[in-house]
Amino acid sequence: MQRMLIPTGSKCIDSLLGGGVETGTVTQIYGHGGTGKTTLCLMLAKNAAEQFKVAYIDTEGLSGERVRQIFGDERLFSNVFVYEVYRFRQQGVAIQEAEKLCRSEKVKLVIVDCFTSLYRSELEDDRKQIKIKRELTSQLTFLLGMARKYDVAVVITNQMFTDVGSGVDRPLGGPSLEHLSKVIIALERSNELRKATLIKHRWMKEGKSCFYRITDRGIEP
């Protein structure tokens, strides 16, 4: 099946992805705070909303001002179904609701921003850790199945943690998230600029990087 590409609107990021985010699979964007993960998601949502509907699961509280900066035309934002979730269990319910929209509406992009923030807060309870980790994997497995079944692009953002043993910063979720995400982009600070690196892709060259700035208009170039 010929997959569609949804452009991010950033020349830097689109060059790494071969034109944009691919439908039929899961793309993971990870990085520390302030690297532009949500900005990139909003840019993707705007581009998709010009022709299709978008399901946006928001776990961190979208800034209304940032939405206005990126979208400009509020009528375009009416094509975005926003789910605000505050607990990890609600996130699973919202994902199920997004699947219904893929069936009933012209949804071509599903975003979960951030996929791991509510999971991370639940991890503080040691008694729940195994159950919570299984649920996270289950949610992403469901999203991947949804992407393939309805040929939609699924984009998740992921936070970082410092590995106590090695002192190295790593994305949350471990090998399961890495395996189920078929495309992975790492965002990081690089002095006054930001740097995007393609960690994993099915057909583009991995390891390539580019530099960008975060502005009122989004990610440039």
From Swiss-Prot:
Name of the protein this chain belongs to: DNA repair and recombination protein RadB
Record-linked SMART domains: AAA
PANTHER family: DNA REPAIR AND RECOMBINATION PROTEIN RADB, RECA/RAD51/RADA DNA STRAND-PAIRING FAMILY MEMBER
Pfam families: Rad51
Role played: Involved in DNA repair and in homologous recombination. May regulate the cleavage reactions of the branch-structured DNA. Has a very weak ATPase activity that is not stimulated by DNA. Binds DNA but does not promote DNA strands exchange.
Gene that this polypeptide is encoded by: radB
Binding site for ATP: 31-38
One GO term (biological process): DNA recombination
Single GO MF descriptor: ATP hydrolysis activity
Species assigned in the record: Archaeoglobus fulgidus (strain ATCC 49558 / DSM 4304 / JCM 9628 / NBRC 100126 / VC-16)
Chain coiled-coil ranges: none
Family according to the record: Belongs to the eukaryotic RecA-like protein family. RadB subfamily.
Annotated keywords: ATP-binding, DNA damage, DNA recombination, DNA-binding, Nucleotide-binding
Recorded superkingdom: Archaea
